[in-house]
Regions:
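Carbohydrate-interacting/catalytic domains
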Residues: 2-8, 16, 21, 25-195
Length: 195
C-alpha cells in the first residue's frame, strides 16, 4: 500500500544521486500484470494510460506531495547529489536503516522505517566523525520533511510510523568550524581533493 510507496520513494531519492518514477507511482498503483508478476498492469510499458490526478488527490491516493518535497530537499542539499559520500550508521532495529551523506558543509542524515505495516522504534548510533563532528558533540538537526528541529548527538531515539512519519531526512547544522571539506569529497568524480 501507500506506506511502502512512501518509504521506497525516500530511499530512492536519498540513496542515489539520480532518481525518477514511472507515471502512476505517485498514485501507488500496484496491480500486477498477472498473478505473481512483478510487472504492473498499468506500467505504460505497453500503453498510455490517462489518470485522474485530481480525484486521486481528493481521495488521498497520491504521494505526489511527498515526491515534490523530496525533489525540493534534493535541490537544497548538494550532499544528496553524491554517491561515494554515502555512509551507513548503526540502528538497534533491523527494520530501521540510517545513513548519511556529507559534501563540504552540507550534511544530511536519513533514517527510514523499512516496515510499511508497523511502527518501528530504534536507537540510531551516528559515526560523528563522518559528519565532521567531535565524539561528544550535540547539534541541532532539522527534519526536512516536517520542519521539526531536534538536538542529536552520538545516540538518538527515533519512532517512525508508516503513513504518518515513515522517515526523517535531517539536515545537520554543522558548527561554523566544522564546514571544511569532508574526507569523501575528494573521492567524487570531478571534485578536486586539494583545498
Amino acid at each position: 500500500g501507500r506506506p511502502a510507496f512512501e518509504l521506497r520513494a525516500v530511499l530512492a531519492a536519498t540513496l542515489s544521486p539520480t532518481w525518477g518514477v514511472y507515471s502512476g507511482y505517485e498514485l501507488c498503483e500496484n496491480t500486477p500484470l498477472k498473478p505473481g508478476s512483478e510487472e504492473y498492469l498499468d506500467s505504460e510499458k505497453y500503453q498510455l494510460r490517462p489518470r485522474d490526478w485530481d480525484a486521486a488527490a481528493q481521495d488521498g491516493r497520491t504521494i505526489a506531495p511527498l515526491i515534490t518535497a523530496l525533489n525540493e530537499i534534493r535541490r537544497r542539499h548538494p550532499a544528496l547529489h553524491g554517491l561515494r559520500n554515502l555512509r551507513f550508521h548503526r540502528t538497534g532495529n533491523d527494520a530501521v536503516i540510517a545513513y548519511s551523506k556529507r559534501t563540504g558543509p552540507d550534511a544530511v542524515v536519513v533514517v527510514v522505517n523499512l516496515d510499511p505495516h508497523h511502527t518501528q522504534e530504534a536507537t540510531v548510533t551516528l559515526d560523528l566523525a563522518e559528519l565532521g563532528l567531535g565524539g561528544d558533540e550535540n547539534v541541532p538537526v532539522r527534519d526536512e520533511l516536517t520542519g521539526e528541529t531536534y538536538r542529536w548527538g552520538r545516540t538518538n531515539y527515533v519512532r517512525l510510523e508508516p503513513g504518518r512519519a515513515p522517515a526523517h531526512i535531517l539536515h545537520v547544522r554543522l558548527p561554523a568550524g566544522n564546514a571544511s571539506p569532508s574526507p569523501q569529497d575528494s573521492s567524487q568524480i570531478g571534485v578536486s581533493g586539494t583545498p
